[in-house]
Amino acid sequence: LSEKTQGPSDIKGVSLVPLLREVSETSLEYRFLEVGIDSATSVANFILHGPSDAPPSDPEKLHELGADFWPLALVRALDDAILHLRTNRSDIGNWVIRVTGNGSLIREYDEFLLLHSSDWLSREIRLYWIRVLKRLDVTSRSLMALIEGGDGFSGTLFELALACDRIYMLDDNDSSAISLSAMNFGTLPMANGLSRLQTRFLGDDSRIIELHKIKGKLLSAQVADSLGLVTEIPDEIDWDEEVRLAIEERSSFSGDALTGLEANLRFAGPETIETKIFGRLSAWQNWIFQRPNAVGPKGSLPLYGTGQRVQFDKMRV
């Protein structure tokens, strides 16, 4: 297998040292990621932090940084947090994602990885991001992005928002902004082989061309809404109430019904071997149809038409 890979055969690897993290019942903490866990509301609040320094000047500097290189450090932490919550906290059905940081710096890191895409480590980091974003796509949790100040949701980190079921952006006179980079146009494909923008605007190639022309530009809430890049843009007066209602609404539904609904909506477009296995099929055939919520004595099918209230188990797969 190694003989078929690109690049020299005498490369020197980097050490993926154990992640520095603090784990408790209510939080996960990493260098560039914090996750607060609220069992009462069934919410995990993700806060991802952008870089504080500019990217290295060349691939040699990248190799020297190794696991401390911001995109690699962040994606390792995100991967770990996703797996931890999926495995150990099936009671937490809502994941809310926020980002802080300098959007310009984030786009510079995107440009660095693409400029040096022939370097093996740069390529592996991009492939790592592809895998982790796909892992988020197939996670049976309700995903919501909150853009409430700053321009941290830029380039690669805007892919996190595009992976979410809903994107709420605060309409606050341009202090909140998003921006696109080349990473958003096919470099980080989904399981269906399309970019998340292509999946969002399925069949509307003209919209993708339009968005490509404005990559790198800061887009306000009003502009993002007009382009279809966000779900809702509440103002400061309505923000807290709209977000609270959206989360409470998701929490009130059957977790299994949401797993099916969200899988259906996330995997539009071409059916591939990957989506057949990990998209709708896993959600419906391997989970929903066998669960007590559907076929148990207090489930929706036996009680259909009886007038009795269904008792849903809110645990997620």
Which residues make up each language-model segment?
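Helix-capping/helix-break motifs at membrane-protein junctions
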Residues: 202, 235-236
